[in-house]
């Protein structure tokens, strides 16, 4: 468990562990819906998630037992605010979580929006991940050079939202021909730059929270990216059904749900 320096932060840490158990439970539910978990194994999976949460909570209590019973009081210069960690975790849900989700659905997006072969759609979708080679270290560099890391992270997060909004405008018929595909690829790479620069700027802040527990903080922030990815992908898997596509949605419904997903 992560060491915190106040009772308030202790309860904050407990609270920020709840989404881990919640998203694992949702994942179990989805696996049961698709038939991977049976009616007998589904309850076992939920019990395992509950057992993990209890074990994790006990680890937090054990690490901070001296703080809880009042035998250890941290001096002001040794304290840090857990809300800084929580902000980084929530930011990483937005950037890295959305990256994992978008990478998973982009081939389908290009395939059904432009009626492309699967191989070509996959190649075009790879441009989103390719930008990572430059964008993620650039995010950290920009954060260092500007000197105001919080504002940099906020600006890149807003750019991320604007980029996804632009991508949601790419629908069948709105961008056509080779020029339309090139425009879609350009918008994809532009959006990817903000997403992955945001990831770099987020982790540029991690070592500044508390040096003694930097590794644990980095682990928690990174794990929240997976929470975001599973959340977004669950929404993505349900969008065709919500849009009236039923269990076997048409290509038109899939294309429409792909565009709508970027607005999420």
Predicted regions and their residues:
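A late C-terminal transmembrane helix in Major Facilitator Superfamily
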Residues: 211-245
């Amino acid at each position: 468990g992560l060491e915190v320096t106040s009772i308030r932060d202790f309860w904050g840490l407990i609270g920020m562990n709840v989404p881990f158990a919640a998203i694992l439970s949702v994942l179990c539910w989805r696996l049961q819906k698709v038939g991977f978990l049976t009616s007998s194994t589904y309850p076992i999976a939920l019990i395992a998630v509950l057992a993990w949460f209890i074990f994790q909570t006990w680890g937090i209590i054990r690490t901070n037992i001296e703080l809880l019973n009042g035998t250890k009081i941290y001096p002001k210069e040794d304290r840090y605010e857990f809300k800084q960690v929580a902000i980084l975790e929530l930011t990483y849900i937005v950037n890295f979580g959305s990256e994992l989700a978008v990478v998973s659905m982009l081939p389908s997006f290009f395939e059904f929006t432009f009626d492309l072969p699967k191989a070509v759609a996959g190649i075009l979708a790879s441009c989103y991940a390719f930008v990572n080679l430059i964008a993620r270290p650039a995010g950290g560099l920009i954060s260092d050079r500007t000197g105001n890391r919080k504002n940099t992270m906020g600006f890149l997060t807003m750019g991320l939202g604007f980029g996804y909004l632009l991508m949601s405008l790419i629908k069948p018929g709105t961008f056509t021909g080779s020029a339309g595909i090139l425009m879609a690829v350009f918008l994809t790479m532009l959006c990817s730059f903000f997403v992955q620069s945001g990831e770099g700027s987020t982790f540029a802040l991690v070592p500044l929270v508390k040096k003694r527990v930097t590794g644990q903080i980095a682990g928690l922030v990174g794990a929240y990216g997976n929470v975001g990815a599973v959340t977004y992908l669950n929404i993505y898997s349900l969008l065709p059904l919500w849009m009236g596509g039923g269990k076997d949605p048409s290509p038109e419904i899939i294309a429409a749900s792909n565009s709508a997903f970027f607005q999420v």
